[in-house]
UniProtKB/Swiss-Prot annotation:
Gene giving rise to this polypeptide: morn5
MORN repeats mapped onto the chain: 8-30, 31-53, 54-75
Biological source species: Xenopus tropicalis (Western clawed frog)
SMART domains: MORN
Family annotation (Pfam families): MORN (PF02493)
The name this protein goes by in its record: MORN repeat-containing protein 5
Major location category of this protein: other
Amino acid sequence: MEYTGSEYKGERLHGRLEGKGEYILPTETRYEGEMKDGMFHGQGTLFFPNGSKYVALWDHGIALQGKYTFADGLEYDKEDWRYCDQYDRRFYTEICDGLKPAGRSQLTDLDPPRKIPDGCYDCGDGFYNPLTRVVNDYQHKFLRNADDDEHEWIIQKCRKGWDETTGYRPKQSQSTKT
């Protein structure tokens, strides 16, 4: 663990992580639960630095079933995910606390929203710099490098740190396209 920057407190068997324990990754994500032969095995929970958590049943490091809960208490539902979709654009705090009056609309679930550094995007767990393709957490510590799919998703879907004036864009018909 000294090589990875991880930390483990818990039971061992023949020098291997085995039984109940707490495993802390260098990103400060923490696993509490059962281990077998050095892997998550049995009931266990991942606690993320942003306050969210994933409670799961693990089999040799693979989550067989689990439930993700965001820091604000919203639970992810894989089958019927209706949060902030085309039918209901409210953030979870607006669902719980009601909408704000006109002129004070929320830009994010967090109100007031975080200030995004110039040239970056807020991707939900940190700020993304498209030039370096690096995601840093909100305290500006490295989280990960974005692959091509995540890069495209962030560019298309996430809030950016600058304003763009787009103006009216009439829908072009097929005959007027060049």
